[in-house]
Amino acid sequence: MAGRAQGARWMARRVIGLTGGIATGKSTVGRLLAGWGIPVIDADLLAREAVAPGSAALAEIVQHYGSTMLTNAGALDRSALARIIFSDPQERRWVESRIHPSVRAAMQAAVEREPGTICLMIPLLFEAGMTDLVTEIWVVSCKPERQHARLKERDGLDDQAIAARIASQWPLTEKVRHADVVLDNDGDFAHLKIQVERALDQASI
């Protein structure tokens, strides 16, 4: 697939790009891989670090939107920012342009440090243009009704908020179309685990 990592230094190991839709089960797969000793680098955690108190990205966000973006403790008010970025695609792109470069740099550094197989768990793997960092793409998929139910249970979101978050990403069907491995998370944990084990047994793509 075009844009995938190339060159001799990538051929000796696998760089798994783990992605999917919101609340489809990416973290569950990540925990499975980590439990088997595979380093898992979480883009969401890196994004949080990118806007930590004192960071340049947080300063830019506050300058752009005002001090209402901060909690009383001086941290980013994620709920306040979410209300903006999930209602305005242009503002979402502006915020992402302040965060994604540092996330990408950290991912690249992790790949260069790790000589063996590594997993980059990146929800916006396609949207952020990071497919060139990986040698294969795994997409965790589930039916829309299960995705909605998980978002309601996990995040307490209403239907409008759920729709906005899902619409902010590529359609799951499109991600599946670009995947090397599709993990169906409509069944139970045992079913998902078997699929992950099989994917690991595959030869590097």
Swiss-Prot record:
Main location class: cytoplasm
Recorded GO CC terms: cytoplasm
Domain DPCK: 15-205
Recorded GO MF terms: ATP binding; dephospho-CoA kinase activity
Any Pfam family matching the protein: CoaE
Localization in the cell: Cytoplasm
GO biological process: coenzyme A biosynthetic process
InterPro entries (alphabetical): Depp_CoAkinase, P-loop_NTPase
Swiss-Prot/TrEMBL keywords: ATP-binding, Coenzyme A biosynthesis, Cytoplasm, Kinase, Nucleotide-binding, Transferase
Biological or metabolic pathway of the protein: Cofactor biosynthesis; coenzyme A biosynthesis; CoA from (R)-pantothenate: step 5/5
Keyword Lipid metabolism in record: no
Name of the top EC class for this enzyme: transferase
EC number: 2.7.1.24
Reaction(s) catalysed (UniProt annotation): 3'-dephospho-CoA + ATP = ADP + CoA + H(+)
UniProt superkingdom: Bacteria
PANTHER family assigned to the protein according to its UniProt record, in alphabetical order: BIFUNCTIONAL COENZYME A SYNTHASE-RELATED (PTHR10695:SF46), DEPHOSPHO-COA KINASE-RELATED (PTHR10695)
Function of the protein: Catalyzes the phosphorylation of the 3'-hydroxyl group of dephosphocoenzyme A to form coenzyme A.
Entries under HAMAP family matching the protein: Dephospho_CoA_kinase (MF_00376)
Family assignment from sequence similarity: Belongs to the CoaE family.
Name of the protein: Dephospho-CoA kinase
Gene name of the record: coaE
